[in-house]
């Protein structure tokens, strides 16, 4: 799934992927113990970005409590710079699925499968085996029947059973939960492909039934990664959606080595090691194409399993937790958070976007600082609202796509700190990347004057008229904008159209792009103004069904997942945000929907890649998004801590939220 930047991250602007989006975090039953194993959700789940905060003051780091005597000692101190919106997992996936809420969320869910990092290998979590073949029920439905490992328990001592999966799905369906719940547990109907039933065959066998023959996207990287929560605890609150989302979560049972400790809204949050936990220990061995896991701590079920290709070079590490307390301290902004880091108040800063290059270079000269640089599995983008004029007009969107000179901004303004990205797929996923077509290809390499002329031609060919089409003087000068513009139906574009983007304090890259793109649209005769806006404000405006027609343009980002099925989540018409999904532009193309259905049914990766490229070709032409850039993920940590690995696509924040379950604090 994906996530708003990011796995545990910005609003599934953090598909952590497949519905596995980053939007969703680590759903492994080993949750914060074997954090190298995490399920996606998006993640697909919404999407790359860390919310910008304006209200929370910088604070003094929280005072750590004494760890439980029977557990590990030591405190792992992390900084955050936007306030989590909930500690309730149901609420998090429903309407508050931003990265900051995800970072601090306790391990309240389990999943059948998980994802092993840093190699992104599909593994079991609660399931005792990977079930990859469905059964045709002969009535238009298909089922996957999965055995669950017996012996796992929630922290309140109740057993993790198949009933938790059956009840969770029933709750999502009966209470009509929205947001990422629609992605991780898509409810099937006569009109929509999805899950139609989840049944506990017995306490340790669950049967998941679809109204189509679900492939990789729908099963292995979809429902098999979806969260299940404790029926014993949450059942008392599941009377209606509002009651469930408002239910207290500070004592909610977890499948993790940590439980909530101190929760001081607007200041700090802490986890404490649970001395009664079974979720600790074990050895993980990572291969380029496979993972081995051995676990026998005398308390949890003994496990010795391998997945994928376990040949070639490898490395192994012991699993934690190795600390007694995990501390999240809230600071007012990035600058305050990294100042605290420089002063030794925190060990690591959770930042879905990574450090700015100049600060990274500055910190590289500091004593006691370790540096990490990884490729990003995400993107920054601008969205058009296709439900209202002028975003509803294809020629308008294409003209904007043509006039925007991303390479100019990247190289001349941003000094090369970002990397151009045209399509939906990160360049690192070479087999998934489609060739650039349409206006982006036609306008590539053109001068400013040529781009302006081409954009005007696109408008004219699309039926637009103007009293005066203006002109471009050549060179770097601004164009004389057209006047009296009217769309193909004679409609005059609105005045003072706002382009919402995070401010420079939160993300100077998107802030800079918003200023240039607003100016380029003005040169085409459109009254567009860049409006710096807090991250959470943008999210509320564009991802809330009742506001789906109340904006023109916005910029956010997505952290993507382990399986790149995010185009279906972001652009299939049945995922429209007006109906609670992640299709914020309101893109509606029957041909795309048909390809999305084929993609969801694909059972071979090669087939999924071919279909994905056809979907991308439509997006290049219709342009619901103008994809902007991606960036390297730059991170730093203090040398008093150590991680089992640091080389991982999307970085330590994006894949493991700082890996609190495996970090070691050196005394």
Where would I find each of the regions flagged by the language model?
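Extracellular/periplasmic solute-recognition and catalytic clefts
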Residues: 172-186, 261-272, 306, 312-316, ...
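Structural transition elements
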Residues: 420-483, 502-512, 603-605
């Amino acid at each position: 799934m994906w996530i708003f930047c990011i796995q545990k991250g910005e609003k599934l602007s953090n598909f952590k992927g497949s519905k596995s989006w980053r939007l969703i975090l680590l759903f492994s039953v080993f949750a914060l113990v074997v954090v190298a194993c995490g399920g996606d959700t998006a993640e697909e789940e919404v999407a790359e970005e860390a919310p910008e905060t304006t209200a929370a003051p910088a604070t003094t780091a929280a005072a750590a409590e004494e760890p439980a005597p029977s557990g590990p000692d030591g405190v792992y101190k992390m900084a955050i710079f936007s306030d989590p919106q909930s500690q309730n997992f149901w609420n998090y996936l429903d309407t508050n699925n931003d990265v900051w809420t995800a970072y601090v969320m306790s391990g309240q869910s389990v999943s059948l499968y998980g994802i092993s990092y840093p190699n992104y290998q599909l593994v079991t979590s609660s399931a005792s085996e990977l079930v990859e073949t469905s059964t045709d029920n002969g009535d238009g439905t298909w089922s996957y029947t999965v055995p669950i490992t017996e012996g796992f328990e929630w922290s309140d001592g109740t057993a993790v059973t198949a009933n938790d999966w059956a009840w969770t799905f029933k709750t999502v369906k009966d209470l009509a939960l929205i947001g990422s719940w629609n992605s991780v547990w898509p409810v099937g109907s006569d009109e929509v492909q999805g899950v139609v039933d989840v049944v506990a065959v017995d306490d340790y066998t669950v049967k998941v039934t679809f109204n189509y023959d679900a492939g990789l996207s729908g099963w292995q990287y979809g429902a098999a990664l979806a969260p299940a929560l404790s029926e014993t605890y949450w059942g008392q609150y599941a009377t209606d959606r509002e009651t469930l989302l408002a239910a207290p979560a500070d004592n909610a049972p977890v499948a993790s080595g940590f439980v909530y400790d101190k929760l001081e809204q607007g200041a700090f949050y802490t986890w404490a090691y649970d001395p009664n936990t079974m979720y600790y220990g074990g050895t993980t061995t990572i291969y380029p194409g496979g993972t081995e896991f051995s676990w026998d701590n005398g308390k949890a079920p003994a496990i010795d399993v391998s997945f994928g290709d376990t040949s070639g070079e490898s490395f192994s590490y012991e699993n934690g937790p190795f600390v007694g307390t995990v501390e999240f301290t809230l600071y007012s902004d990035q600058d305050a958070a990294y100042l605290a880091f420089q002063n030794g108040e925190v060990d690591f800063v959770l930042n879905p976007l990574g450090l700015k290059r100049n600060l990274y270079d500055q910190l590289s000269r500091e004593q006691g600082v370790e540096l990490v640089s990884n490729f990003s599995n995400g993107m920054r983008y601008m969205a058009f609202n296709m439900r209202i004029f002028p975003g509803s007009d294809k020629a308008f969107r294409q003209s904007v796509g043509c006039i925007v000179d991303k390479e100019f901004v990247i190289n001349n303004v941003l000094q090369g700190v970002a990397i151009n990205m045209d399509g939906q797929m990160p360049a690192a996923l070479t087999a998934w990347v489609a060739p650039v077509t349409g206006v982006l290809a036609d306008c590539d390499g053109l001068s400013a004057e040529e781009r302006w002329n081409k954009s005007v031609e696109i408008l004219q060919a699309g039926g637009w008229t103007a009293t005066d089409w203006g002109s471009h003087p050549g060179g770097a000068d601004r164009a004389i904008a057209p006047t009296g513009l009217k769309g193909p139906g004679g409609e005059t574009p609105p005045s003072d159209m706002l382009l919402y983007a995070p401010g420079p304090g939160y993300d100077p890259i998107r802030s800079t792009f918003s200023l240039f793109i607003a100016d380029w649209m003005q040169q085409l005769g459109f009254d567009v103004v860049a409006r710096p806006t807090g991250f959470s404000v943008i999210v509320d405006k564009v991802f809330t069904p009742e506001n789906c027609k109340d904006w023109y343009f916005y910029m956010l980002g997505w952290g993507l997942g382990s399986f790149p099925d995010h185009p279906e989540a972001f652009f299939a018409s049945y995922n429209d945000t007006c109906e609670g999904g992640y299709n914020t532009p309101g893109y509606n193309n029957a041909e795309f929907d048909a390809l999305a259905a084929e993609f969801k049914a694909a059972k071979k990766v090669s087939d999924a890649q071919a279909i994905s490229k056809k979907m991308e070709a439509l997006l290049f032409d219709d342009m619901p998004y103008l994809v902007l850039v991606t960036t390297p993920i730059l991170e730093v940590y203090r040398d008093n801590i150590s991680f089992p690995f640091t080389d991982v696509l999307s970085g330590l924040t994006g894949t493991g939220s700082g890996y609190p379950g495996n970090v070691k604090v050196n005394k």
